[in-house]
């Protein structure tokens, strides 16, 4: 008795700790697409006194066992046994290697960590059937010296699979619909294909009788489990297989005796929360488990005889981590079914949804709305952003607020560097001159207050662009002479023709200065003198009109495109048109008229 008590008091604590809740390892994805899953933990040992050990090790072993018996008239006893057992995974850790010499562990606490990456195609745990199973066990061993017994600690762990996030085929609604000619048209659907063991399956029925006075009787719902076992070396070394079908759950509704041209109802089929009653879907080497929903609808015909409508839907059952928790966690599977089995919205119901406006506008990848001329699909229900003034103002306010938030403390908005966030705002240019050199230097700075996002986002229509004659000048044009300035300088550098008065010069690329009253009087007197001279010398009126037309062209050497107020009807050779052009240009008094 003293020896036994001494053995028990050597270690006050000896356990295998797994870094997973409920000792449950969840593998994300199916066997053909899952990534490696980590398994880690530690072996903890608390010694009350010093002991002498040879080695300390840990071993992870996964075993698969398939066994069943079947009657056989040729075998004594009438039973033929098929059995196969093999190791599906094995991993060893040596914490204290065996070297032949003993090692003394003093009293205290010891912890030996372990870690392994389990392959994605590893077989998951299968438990609950007597004929087959796949189990994983951790076994820690401490080999002691002399007559002391070996210290062994075992821990059972489970490996389960969870559906990947991109498994769309398991989250979509599945249904079966058909028409029984001259009898009934039916649709039976479930919201998703995959369900958690311990939850429930909502089943929706839509029945439309095609025969007058046809009524719906009882509706039967049954969940079937199909198990297929196979061994490569069974009785006498021969391969053998076995198919087994069992009923997991069943439900039957009451008869619908009332007459109607449309029946629609939903029934919930609760799933068991025990692996003994229901297993998960799996496809392993030698073990295959599938599930199906079977439906049977009784139809009462007008003549009194009963017809039966049958249909089936395949479903996938998965093991949830909550199944191994306490009772409250298991009950949450049914209470929170909508969060576990919420199907994704269909494309038809979501294609016209408006984007969420509460996001940050700092990383916009799309340009601002281009205006009412943006192409748009016919009969489209999508929002028209060009006509939505509130949305445009909200966008401008958000961009301006973001620019102010990104400014460092102590800096004005004009001191923003364009290299910080070049995509936030279009740059605003400030042109200055270098007083020391006299050369103009362009200092590009960002100024959100001077930038009109509303103007930048507007694109004129084709009609407005073709009618507008005012050129859109860039702020950089002031550093280099424009084409109009060069043409005007060349025109002024030429010697003036005799009898031609130089018109007032243009002071800016976008407008002209009207002539003064003295200039108009000098022009009137000069034209009167020329007319009297031409009359006395025999000059024809065509020469006079040509000189007036030349005077009109000299006042605008760049053509009518640079001066929008110039009439486009002025042409050389027409005396009336030349006078009208000069009068409209305010270069002739209103009382001046053509003299014959």
UniProtKB/Swiss-Prot annotation:
GO biological process, one term: ubiquitin-dependent endocytosis
Pfam families for the chain: Arrestin_C, Arrestin_N
Subcellular location: Membrane
Comp. bias (Polar residues): 405-420, 430-446, 504-522
One annotated GO molecular function: calcium ion binding
Low complexity bias: start-end ranges: 531-555
Keywords in alphabetical order: Membrane, Phosphoprotein, Transmembrane, Transmembrane helix
Annotated positions of the Phosphothreonine modification: 373-374, 502, 507
Main location (coarse class): membrane
Region described as Disordered: spans on this chain: 363-387, 405-446, 493-596
Phosphoserine found at: 452, 474, 493, 497, 514
Ranges that cross the membrane: 194-211
GO terms under cellular component: cytoplasm; cytosol; plasma membrane
Membrane topology classification: Single-pass membrane protein
Record-stated family: Belongs to the arrestin family.
Protein name: Arrestin domain-containing protein C31A2.12
Natural source organism: Schizosaccharomyces pombe (strain 972 / ATCC 24843) (Fission yeast)
